[in-house]
Amino acid sequence: PLTGAANGWGGAPTVADFDGDGRPEFATASANFYYVYSPDCLASPRPAKCTGSDPGVLWQSRTQDSSSGSTGSSVFDFNGDKVAEVVYRDECWLRVYSGPDGKKLFAAPVSSGTDLEMPVIADTDGDGHADIVVPSDSVQGDNCRGPISATELGMPHGPPTQGIKVYKDPMDRWMPSRSIWNQHSYHITNVGDDGSIPTVEASNFMTYNNYRQNVQGAVAGTRTPLGDATGKIGIAPDAGDCIKVYRPSGSICNRGTASLPAGMPSTF
């Protein structure tokens, strides 16, 4: 048994490769925290990447969901680096977390008197880039001014919100995704791109091995985000006594719309 989700009913779980090690981890929300669990974190001594308070916990982040303690979350690799980001909304905030360490990458004030709902990922406008769709209501909005949820990433919460909200990257850097997310237990193989339901469903784990994570894929007529590395080289004389020694220096800039892989070689 794993601790954490016992605070509340526990939200619907997700399965994805959160830390980029090629193996799936799983995550769930409780009334007070969002938890990502990894089998690696059951080892003794625990690996340094495991920063959670309990064995098995890769990381955890403080949240607020006293309404139900059972909200769900979704997962998507927004920047195409083969590491999943977490998308979760509690009573007060929509947040996007870095999969490996739980760093908050994005936050928006979205209030809710929660139940079983969750944000979902889909290309809602057909532009070839994923969007975040999240429901909101004003039931618990007045409770978002306490020490836990009054501010996030330097931004105050403000008044309660309501309605269906869709978020996108204004620079269109998010990777492409399907235009469909058809049910609470969505897992890609349960529905076709045209909304058709397969008579015999293919096993998700044989191809994707995830759960509540939408798939990437280019849409016809749209452009997939790509990295674009440019470099600049400078040579200056050494500051020492010998002016015939020169020290080269260089800078590399990514002017594209997708991240570049770590350890990319460069020559000059």
Which residues fall in each region the model found?
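Extracytoplasmic/lumenal domain signature
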Residues: P1-T224
